[in-house]
C-alpha cells in the first residue's frame, strides 16, 4: 500500500475494542458467574451468531425488527445476527429435542447485536449471559431462576441488589378487564420504558391508545402500593394488585407461592413485587423480573427475564415451557467500574526472565519450563535494552525479574538474580530457591 493511502483505523459507533486489562477483568467476571451457574446445575450450550431472519422474527416484531442487523447473504438467504439468546434457545430445543433431557438447565455466554442508540454500558454489540430452565412449568422453576440471579450476582461481588418481580398474566388480565386486549402489546412496551420517560410523556403515549379514565387506571396499577415513590412489602403490593384485578387469581397465587419459597430460604429481602415490570419482548407469558443495583439505580436493569410458555411452539408441534433470565455483561461490568469494584491491573504472569544474550535462549526456556510448574513465567524474546524490558514488565504488572548470572547443566542449580521489580531489590539464589521463594510469596 502506498504511503498516505492507509485506511483510518476507526471503529463503528456502538462497537468497541477491549484492551487486555479490561478483557481480563471481564473474563474473571465470566468465571465467577460460570462457577455459580455450575453450582446450580446449569450446563453450557452455543448457537450460531447468524440465523435465518424468519427464525428470529417468528415471535418478535416492531422495535425488534427495526433494531436487527439484517441482510441478504451471497446465497440469496434473508439472514440476521441474533438480537438475544432466548429465541435461538427455542430454535435449539426444537432442533435437538430428542437428544436433550428435561428439565433442561442451560447457560450461554455469547455476543448479540442490536441497532439501538449507544449509551453508557450499552452497545450495539454486547455480551449476554443467559440461563434457562426448559421443560418445566412449575413454580419451583420460576423460584430457581430468581434465586439463581441473586446467587450469581452475589458471587460476582454485587451484594446490594433489588430484584423486581411481576407477572405478565396479571397485567393481561387487568387489560382484558379494561377492554384493552387489542392494545396490550403497545401498552406493555410503553410501560416497559416507563423509567426513561417523564410522567407527562408516559401519560400522553398511553392516551394515544385509550381514554384518560383508563389511562389513570393503568397508572394506578403500575404504581400499586407505592408510598411517596417507595415500594412496600411484596405481600402488600400483591394484595393491592389483587384488589385492582378482582381478587385472588391463578397468577397472583403463583406469585405468592414463589414468594413463600423465597421466604423459606430466607432471601426474600432481595425481592419486591413491582407491577410496572412488563418486559418489552412479547414472548413472555408469566413471571417477569428485572434486577437493579441499589447503589446505581440509574444504570438500569443488569439482569432481566421471565417465563415463556409457548415460545418453542413456533418451531415444533408441542410447546415446551421455559423460564430464564439474562445478565448484560457489559452493563454489569460498567457498573462495577463505577463502584470501584474492578481492579486497575490484573496480570497472570508473575515472573519475567530477562533476555541478556540470545545465545542463552535455551537456558532461558529451560528455566521458564522449570518455574512454570509453580509460577507463571515468560521469557523476553530478544536482547533489547534492559530499560525496554523493564518497561514491558512494568506495563504488564509483572512482579519478579530473573537474570541468569551463571548457567549450569542442571537447570535447578543455575545461579540467578531474583529482582523484586516493585522495590528493585536483588537476591542471588540458585534456581530451585528462586522457584520456592516466588511460589511462597506469590
Curated annotation (Swiss-Prot):
InterPro entries (UniProt xref): aa-tRNA-synth_II, aa-tRNA-synth_II/BPL/LPL, His-tRNA-ligase, HisRS-like_core, HisRS/HisZ
Enzyme Commission designation: 6.1.1.21
Listed GO MF terms: ATP binding; histidine-tRNA ligase activity
A family per Pfam: tRNA-synt_His
Protein's GO biological process: histidyl-tRNA aminoacylation
Keywords from the named record: Aminoacyl-tRNA synthetase, ATP-binding, Cytoplasm, Ligase, Nucleotide-binding, Protein biosynthesis
Domain of life: Bacteria
Main location: cytoplasm
Catalytic activity: tRNA(His) + L-histidine + ATP = L-histidyl-tRNA(His) + AMP + diphosphate + H(+)
Gene Ontology CC entries for this record: cytoplasm
Gene3D superfamilies linked to this entry: Bira Bifunctional Protein, Domain 2
Subcellular location: Cytoplasm
Subunit structure, as described in the record: Homodimer.
Entry's family note: Belongs to the class-II aminoacyl-tRNA synthetase family.
Name used for this protein in its record: Histidine--tRNA ligase
Gene label: hisS
Amino acid at each position: 500500500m502506498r504511503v498516505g493511502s492507509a485506511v483510518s483505523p476507526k471503529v463503528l459507533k456502538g462497537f468497541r475494542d477491549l484492551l487486555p486489562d479490561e478483557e481480563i477483568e471481564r473474563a474473571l467476571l465470566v468465571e465467577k458467574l460460570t462457577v455459580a451457574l455450575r453450582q446450580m446445575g446449569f450446563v453450557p450450550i452455543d448457537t450460531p451468531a447468524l440465523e435465518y431472519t424468519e427464525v428470529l422474527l417468528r415471535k418478535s416484531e416492531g422495535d425488534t425488527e427495526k433494531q436487527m442487523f439484517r441482510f441478504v447473504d451471497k446465497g440469496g438467504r434473508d439472514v440476521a445476527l441474533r438480537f438475544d439468546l432466548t429465541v435461538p434457545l427455542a430454535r435449539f430445543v426444537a432442533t435437538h429435542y430428542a437428544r436433550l433431557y428435561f428439565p433442561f438447565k442451560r447457560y450461554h455466554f455469547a455476543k448479540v447485536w442490536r441497532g439501538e442508540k449507544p449509551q453508557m454500558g450499552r452497545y450495539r454489540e454486547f455480551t449476554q449471559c443467559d440461563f434457562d430452565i426448559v421443560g418445566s412449568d412449575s413454580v419451583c422453576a420460576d423460584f430457581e431462576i430468581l434465586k439463581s440471579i441473586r446467587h450469581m450476582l452475589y458471587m460476582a461481588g454485587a451484594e446490594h441488589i433489588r430484584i423486581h418481580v411481576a407477572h405478565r398474566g396479571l397485567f393481561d388480565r387487568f387489560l382484558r378487564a379494561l377492554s384493552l386486549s387489542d392494545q396490550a402489546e403497545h401498552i406493555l412496551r410503553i410501560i416497559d420504558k416507563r423509567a426513561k420517560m417523564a410522567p407527562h410523556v408516559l401519560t400522553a403515549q398511553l392516551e394515544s391508545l385509550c381514554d384518560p379514565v383508563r389511562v389513570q387506571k393503568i397508572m394506578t396499577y403500575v404504581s400499586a402500593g407505592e408510598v411517596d415513590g417507595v415500594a412496600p412489602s411484596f405481600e402488600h403490593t400483591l394484595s393491592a394488585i389483587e384488589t385492582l384485578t378482582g381478587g385472588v387469581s391463578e397468577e397472583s397465587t403463583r406469585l405468592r407461592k414463589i414468594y413463600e419459597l423465597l421466604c423459606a430460604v430466607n432471601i426474600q429481602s432481595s425481592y419486591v413485587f413491582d407491577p410496572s415490570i412488563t418486559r418489552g419482548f412479547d414472548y413472555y407469558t408469566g413471571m417477569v423480573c428485572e434486577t437493579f443495583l441499589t447503589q446505581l439505580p440509574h444504570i438500569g436493569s443488569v439482569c432481566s427475564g421471565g417465563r415463556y410458555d409457548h415460545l418453542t411452539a413456533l418451531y415444533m408441534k408441542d410447546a415446551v415451557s421455559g423460564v430464564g433470565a439474562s445478565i448484560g455483561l457489559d452493563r454489569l461490568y460498567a457498573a462495577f467500574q463505577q463502584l470501584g469494584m474492578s481492579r486497575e491491573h490484573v496480570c497472570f504472569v508473575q515472573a519475567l526472565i530477562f533476555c541478556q544474550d540470545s545465545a542463552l535462549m535455551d537456558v532461558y526456556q529451560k528455566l521458564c519450563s522449570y518455574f512454570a510448574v509453580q509460577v507463571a513465567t515468560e521469557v523476553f524474546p530478544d536482547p533489547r535494552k534492559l530499560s525496554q524490558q523493564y518497561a514491558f514488565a512494568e506495563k504488564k504488572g509483572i512482579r519478579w525479574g530473573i537474570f541468569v548470572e551463571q548457567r549450569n547443566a542442571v537447570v535447578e542449580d543455575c545461579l540467578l538474580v531474583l529482582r523484586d521489580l516493585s522495590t528493585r531489590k536483588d537476591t542471588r539464589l540458585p534456581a530451585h530457591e528462586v522457584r520456592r521463594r516466588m511460589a511462597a510469596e506469590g
